[in-house]
């Protein structure tokens, strides 16, 4: 026998038993962003490598270690997108969507990072994100956070996630803080682990995000970013906090919160959970006012967030909120004998036409009554319809309840659609 080909490590299949939960999640996401007036944008999976080097930053872990980059037959360096924001900005610039305009956009699709696979972190993962362009004020920061809070409400996980907030200031404020932080770290270089020493000059704010206990202990005495902010930054952040309090969104200010991408400024945030162990961040984002100009467009204020769907699915499963997903099939239509098969197919088609949202499956492949009922039960259907010679002669259909302890019923064919509609 030929050797089986396996899926690539860290790139997983979503099987039929798993897809109903994914579909439910995707439906909630689409409906929620739609209710806020956001429009979908779809971008290619493959982009120029330079796009991510210029946006994410050449000295970030993503660009240095994690991107799937290759040279095509024309000699161009291409990369499987590791995140969605840069592609959205590139598309906005290219098609004139961002020039003197406000845009509220959302996207959903697969992303790729060559990380060490573990639960909740994969090499191909699905990301959902929202991006807003052209609005510089704190009210839009509040809106994207309200939108994310609405997602948790609709998914039933509000009590299991908490919001952490910080502000990184503007470019000048962050540059002054960067110099002060480097000077502090240089004085304590011997305490820094290898990663922190590597980041000390190239991206010192990422040292604040170190998971090393000794480094975190050292940082207790480090300069505080907020001490370097001017009135505009303080006012922006204060107004955001006031708006969140006004709509009842609770938050914690985390002065050590920085994002792993270079393009963020001012507001940054993460929604975190204690239910997933080390993979606690379920949504993250912030403001990135300089990125549009950095990628060749007119300087444009921007804010957004992204979430990995695999991690949300894992959270829903961990909290056992995946149990109320409806059946994949409502009605399973069987036929007892060749003479009844054509009518059974016609009945199934009539039900699909009368009940567009009903999930109707026709038995195919023959078999006796026992075999067909076994298939019906395995399908997860609520009821099986049995069409035999007697039913055919009397213009009736037998309805067998598969999930309830109820007697089989005979229903007139012309009343069947109404009966099924009430049942499901």
UniProtKB/Swiss-Prot annotation:
The subunit field of the Swiss-Prot or TrEMBL record says: Homodimer.
Keyword field contains Cell wall biogenesis/degradation: no
Molecular function terms in GO for this entry? ATP binding; histidine-tRNA ligase activity
InterPro entries hit by this protein: aa-tRNA-synth_II, aa-tRNA-synth_II/BPL/LPL, Anticodon-bd, Anticodon-bd_dom_sf, His-tRNA-ligase, HisRS-like_core, HisRS/HisZ, HisRS_anticodon
Alphabetical list of PANTHER family matching this protein: HISTIDINE--TRNA LIGASE, MITOCHONDRIAL-RELATED, HISTIDYL-TRNA SYNTHETASE
- Is Protein biosynthesis one of the keywords? yes
Q: Which GO terms describe its biological process?
A: histidyl-tRNA aminoacylation
Q: Which residues form a coiled coil?
A: none
- Which Gene3D superfamilies has this protein been placed in? Anticodon-binding domain, Bira Bifunctional Protein, Domain 2
Keyword line = Aminoacyl-tRNA synthetase, ATP-binding, Cytoplasm, Ligase, Nucleotide-binding, Protein biosynthesis
Q: Tell where it localizes.
A: Cytoplasm
Q: Which reaction does this enzyme catalyse, per its entry?
A: tRNA(His) + L-histidine + ATP = L-histidyl-tRNA(His) + AMP + diphosphate + H(+)
- Give the family, as the similarity comment puts it: Belongs to the class-II aminoacyl-tRNA synthetase family.
Protein name per the record: Histidine--tRNA ligase
Q: Which GO terms describe its cellular component?
A: cytoplasm
| Enzymatic class | ligase
Q: What is its EC number?
A: 6.1.1.21
């Amino acid at each position: 026998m030929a050797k089986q080909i396996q899926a690539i490590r860290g790139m997983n299949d979503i099987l039929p038993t798993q897809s109903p939960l994914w579909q439910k999640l995707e439906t909630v996401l689409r409906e929620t962003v739609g209710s806020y007036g956001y429009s979908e944008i779809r971008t290619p999976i493959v982009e120029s490598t330079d796009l991510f080097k210029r946006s994410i930053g050449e000295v970030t872990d993503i660009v240095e270690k994690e991107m799937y980059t290759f040279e095509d037959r024309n000699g161009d360096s291409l990369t499987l997108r590791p995140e969605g924001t840069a592609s959205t900005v590139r598309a906005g610039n290219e098609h004139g969507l961002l020039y003197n305009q406000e845009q509220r956009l959302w996207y959903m699709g697969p992303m790729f990072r060559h990380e060490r696979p573990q639960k909740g972190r994969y090499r191909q993962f699905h990301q959902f994100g929202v991006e807003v362009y052209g609005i510089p004020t704190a009210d839009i920061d509040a809106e994207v956070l309200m939108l994310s809070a609405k997602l948790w409400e609709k998914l039933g996980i509000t009590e299991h996630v908490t919001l952490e907030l910080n502000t990184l200031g503007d470019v000048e404020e962050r540059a002054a803080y960067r110099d002060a932080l480097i000077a502090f770290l240089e004085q304590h270089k011997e305490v820094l682990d290898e990663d922190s020493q590597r980041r000390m000059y190239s991206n010192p704010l990422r040292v604040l995000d170190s998971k090393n206990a000794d480094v975190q202990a050292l940082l207790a005495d480090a300069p505080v970013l907020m001490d370097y902010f001017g009135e505009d930054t303080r006012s922006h952040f204060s107004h955001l906090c006031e708006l969140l309090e006004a709509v009842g969104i609770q938050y914690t200010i985390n002065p050590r919160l920085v994002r792993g991408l270079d393009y963020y400024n001012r507001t940054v945030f993460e929604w975190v959970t204690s239910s997933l162990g080390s993979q606690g961040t379920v949504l993250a984002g912030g403001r990135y006012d300089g990125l549009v100009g950095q990628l060749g467009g007119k300087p444009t204020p921007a804010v957004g967030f992204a979430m990995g769907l695999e991690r949300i699915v894992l959270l829903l499963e961990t909290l056992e909120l995946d149990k109320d997903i409806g059946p994949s099939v409502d009605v399973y239509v069987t036929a007892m004998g060749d003479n009844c098969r054509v009518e059974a197919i016609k009945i199934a088609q009539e039900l699909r036409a009368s009940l567009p949202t009903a999930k109707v499956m026709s038995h195919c492949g023959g078999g006796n009554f026992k075999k067909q009922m076994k298939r019906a039960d395995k399908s997860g259907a609520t009821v099986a319809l049995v069409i035999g010679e007697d039913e055919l002669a009397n213009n009736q259909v037998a309805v067998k309840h598969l999930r309830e302890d109820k007697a089989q019923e005979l229903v007139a064919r012309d009343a069947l659609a109404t009966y099924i509609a009430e049942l499901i």
